[in-house]
Amino acid sequence: MEFSTQTTASLHQIKTAALAVGVFADGVLSAAAEVIDRASHGAVAAVVKSEFRGRTGGTLVLRSLAGVSAQRVVLVGLGKQAEYNARAHASAEQAFAAACVAAQVGEGVSTLAGVAIEGVPVRARARSAAIAAGAAAYHYDATFGKANRDARPRLKKIVQVVDRAASAQTQLGLREGAAIAHGMELTRTLGNLPGNVCTPAYLGNTAKKLAREFKSLKVEVLERKQVEALGMGSFLSVARGSEEPLRFIVLRHAGKPAKKDKAGPVVLVGKGITFDAGGISLKPAATMDEMKYDMCGAASVLGTFRALAELELPLDVVGLIAACENLPSGKANKPGDVVTSMSGQTIEILNTDAEGRLVLCDALTYAERFKPAAVIDIATLTGACVVALGNVNSGLFSKDDALADALLAASRQSLDPAWRLPLDDAYQDQLKSNFADIANIGGPPAGAVTAACFLSRFTKAYPWAHLDIAGTAWRGGKDKGATGRPVPLLMQYLLDQAG
């Protein structure tokens, strides 16, 4: 999608397929809605009084209003005026874009970013507007037959009407939001593709395609022999159960930071299990199809790299993706097996369905060579995190308060929420093994915490945080599909680090 700005005092003269104006739940019209109301001789106020309640995200389309050039005026609910905030604004922008999609129009004009929010600058409002619109306009049809693909017109452009003084900051925010939306689109599509299409090799080829598109990106894709030479015994043990060959993907964004005495790069590590049947510890059949989403950590790394490369962010960033399948076979891991990780630590595999940590631990050890300023791993790691936090907050684990605080601040600003969970040393006792340095599970209690504790054993050399996105990377049910999270959180963190 494209986003741009327009400055005008004559909203009623704008020629567009759809014009969005905000209405609060208490019947108060936004400044833009008042302009359209006057031009239409009170038509907006009359509708608001009789049938439009202005609830957050609600819409009502008015066609061919007298005195207004727009083909459609879309009334968008902003909720209660006293409670209007950044999240309500994002919901309104997404609702407008969804209304445009439903009306099959290719472009629209929004006045919503111009509605002031205390403590939220126009740049941030514009950024969230673009992200929200991109989410509403997303459409998946990659695996439909030609006859069943949706051929309706796509929403391609939204223009934000702003004051002249706010135009530059709005344009900057829209540019940032558009890049994040494009990254989320890639992340969602990779997640939604089936496991027989989105294989480890497919992820590697996607990374190479990004490097061809963006000059700031360099990509190296390692295969089995190279991974064996590195001594990644834990990662290899998971991959051994599948006929699909593994890939270890290394992405580098050379951002040319302004600081000469710069710290090392930020490293993003993504879990890339392109299908997880659980291995010998086989998962139940019900909803196993959703285990194609077990690579959403890897997908979010690729989506984030697409966004930061589009923005040419002045920050050095490295991405690491350990990609393979976790399937049962005669060569698969067995409960009780002991494997040696790249770090030299031995691991007793008590449950082969706790495989994400087995591939991540070697990637986290590999990250040491970059002398990173910070390492953040992203993984659909535990069902226990879903039990704890549901589908709203991603789980955040870190012993580094500064890194955790920066990520939490980014989560709030990006409207991509995370919640910090404990990482106390006392939980490490659950991972004791009689036969190896560490067990790969710690029993039912505090499953998300002990999974993070396991990973922490491989992160002593740098500041580290773990994002468990098992509850937030995709939705189930009738709206089943990948969400694109936590690309907004990660990009906001990187934007903050770049200054």
UniProtKB/Swiss-Prot annotation:
Q: Which GO terms describe its cellular component?
A: cytoplasm
A single GO BP: proteolysis
Q: Which cysteines are joined by disulfide bonds?
A: none
Among Pfam families, the record links this protein to: Peptidase_M17 (PF00883), Peptidase_M17_N (PF02789)
Q: Where is the active site?
A: K283, R357
EC number, as in UniProt: 3.4.11.1, 3.4.11.10
Q: How is the cofactor bound?
A: Binds 2 manganese ions per subunit.
Highest taxon, organism lineage: Bacteria
Positions of Mn(2+) 1 binding: D276, D353, E355
Which cofactor names does the annotation list? Mn(2+)
GO molecular function terms attached to this record: manganese ion binding; metalloaminopeptidase activity
Q: Which reaction does it catalyse?
A: Release of an N-terminal amino acid, Xaa-|-Yaa-, in which Xaa is preferably Leu, but may be other amino acids including Pro although not Arg or Lys, and Yaa may be Pro. Amino acid amides and methyl esters are also readily hydrolyzed, but rates on arylamides are exceedingly low; Release of an N-terminal amino acid, preferentially leucine, but not glutamic or aspartic acids
Function of the protein: Presumably involved in the processing and regular turnover of intracellular proteins. Catalyzes the removal of unsubstituted N-terminal amino acids from various peptides.
Protein family (similarity comment) = Belongs to the peptidase M17 family.
Protein name per the record: Probable cytosol aminopeptidase
**Which lineage do the record's taxonomy fields give for this organism?**
Bacteria, Pseudomonadati, Pseudomonadota, Betaproteobacteria, Burkholderiales
In the UniProt record, the gene name given for this protein reads pepA
